């Protein structure tokens, strides 16, 4: 007598899980794709900025030590970060 009620309850719970729990995973996948697109856009922007900075010969701060630090250490370090992606 109770077997059909238990069976019907199990089917109802499985149906509920199928139609109401799976869209949460799809939303997570969508947000992950959005994050990847944002990161790709930021990496491209950083690459363009680095190219314009390294091509500009007038980019100086007025302090020779700071200029040499920037040209010798910072720009190559940023390029290595970009190459990692």
Swiss-Prot record:
This is Putative uncharacterized protein YDL007C-A. It comes from Saccharomyces cerevisiae (strain ATCC 204508 / S288c) (Baker's yeast).
